[in-house]
Amino acid sequence: MNRIEHYHDWLRDAHAMEKQAESMLESMASRIDNYPELRARIEQHLSETKNQIVQLETILDRNDISRSVIKDSMSKMAALGQSIGGIFPSDEIVKGSISGYVFEQFEIACYTSLLAAAKNAGDTASIPTIEAILNEEKQMADWLIQNIPQTTEKFLIRSETDGVEAKK
């Protein structure tokens, strides 16, 4: 594979990653009942993610990258997302926040590499879009890490209160 083929492959992977993120965020947002700040931020990032998918599809189209291969990449990313997400136990909200942060860091690393590949492949038209997506992922990761302590504290208080659901 040459540098352009690698770049195109990684663009397909980024698209698949965002499709998986969309599913994970939709699932998480639908289960959150008692943590309105977290739910609102996840819903905001879900909206960003849907926009990122459209932006990545524009890049794929501009580079004449076939969408038929995307299905294979999507199944790889689905497996990764499920392994990161897992099935949440009684402390679902805390583990979900941690898993979300880990996934955001994975996305940050992927987009950092994709940005370098875009520059190396000479796809200057896509650089601002990739930089913008990278920035959104960093903002979400920052928000999660800053709010994990408060989510954990709220969970601990709720878990010790009789008749109050804490996990979600």
From Swiss-Prot:
InterPro entries: DUF892_YciF-like, Ferritin-like, Ferritin-like_SF
Name of the protein: Protein YciE
Originating species: Escherichia coli (strain K12)
Gene: yciE
